[in-house]
């Protein structure tokens, strides 16, 4: 793990509706490059809201998100570049997956970045092999099991070679077998030097896995 700060939140405030309570209230946070950070806290404590701010899906009403020391820009071109480097795997994979087949799904994001078809095909093939997706590459996404959908969700992000992957409760609603499978995939990500932020309610796993643990309450 490096001492370099790859992601920083400076006095972040966010509310979903005007005059509503703030989901994030003056959050300050620094994340080191290559670190494994577990986020814990009750539902509604601000974990998911912070994650959505990290890659520009949400824009804070106040404060700054910094990536490599530079404030996030909300112009379309810069946001697309940021989202290629800071990827989110949602708690519910059905919110992320939409293409007909697994292979098409994984190909969509990298092709949207303007990568040449041949290079994209090579990258997709490599990621499918890494995450053991090849056996069901031609299957329709809607026909996959929960664990397989989670594999494809992670592949969606990994194929773009991100610097940060955010996992919002990656083992939620999975049986023990698929939970172990997802945890093994997370270990592979960290072995590649990718910075991983993960929300989890599993205290034992968080303490065993993480370099740092962030405890959130009331958006702080």
Task: Give, region by region, the residue ranges found by the protein language model.
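Conserved ABC ATPase signature
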Residues: 140-144, 148
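The feature captures the beta-strand-to-loop junction immediately N-terminal to the Walker
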Residues: 40-42
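Catalytic Walker B motif of ABC-type/P-loop ATPase nucleotide-binding domains
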Residues: 165-168
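Conserved ABC ATPase "signature" region
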Residues: 118-136
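Helix-to-loop junction immediately C-terminal to a conserved catalytic motif
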Residues: 55
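H-loop/switch region of ABC-family ATPase nucleotide-binding domains
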Residues: 200-201
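Conserved ABC transporter NBD signature motif
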Residues: 63-74, 82
């Amino acid at each position: 793990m490096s001492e370099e700060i790859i992601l920083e939140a400076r006095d972040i405030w966010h509310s979903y509706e005007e005059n509503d309570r703030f989901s994030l209230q003056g959050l300050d946070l620094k994340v080191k490059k290559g670190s494994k950070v577990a986020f814990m806290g009750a539902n509604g404590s601000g974990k998911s809201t912070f994650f959505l701010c990290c890659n520009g899906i949400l824009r804070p009403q106040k404060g700054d998100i910094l990536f490599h020391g530079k404030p996030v820009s909300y112009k379309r071109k810069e946001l697309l570049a940021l989202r290629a480097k800071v990827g989110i795997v949602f708690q519910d994979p059905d919110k992320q997956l939409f293409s007909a087949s697994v292979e098409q799904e994984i190909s969509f994001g990298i092709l949207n970045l303007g990568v040449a078809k041949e290079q994209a095909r090579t990258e997709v093939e490599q990621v499918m092999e890494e995450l053991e997706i090849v056996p069901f590459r031609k299957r329709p996404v809607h026909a996959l099991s929960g664990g397989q959908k989670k594999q494809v969700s992670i592949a969606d992000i990994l194929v773009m070679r991100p610097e940060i992957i955010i996992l919002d409760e990656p083992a939620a609603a999975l049986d023990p077998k698929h939970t172990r499978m997802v945890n093994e995939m997370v270990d592979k990500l960290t072995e590649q030097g990718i910075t991983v932020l993960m929300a989890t309610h599993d205290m034992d796993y968080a303490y065993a896995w993480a370099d740092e643990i962030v405890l959130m309450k009331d958006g702080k």
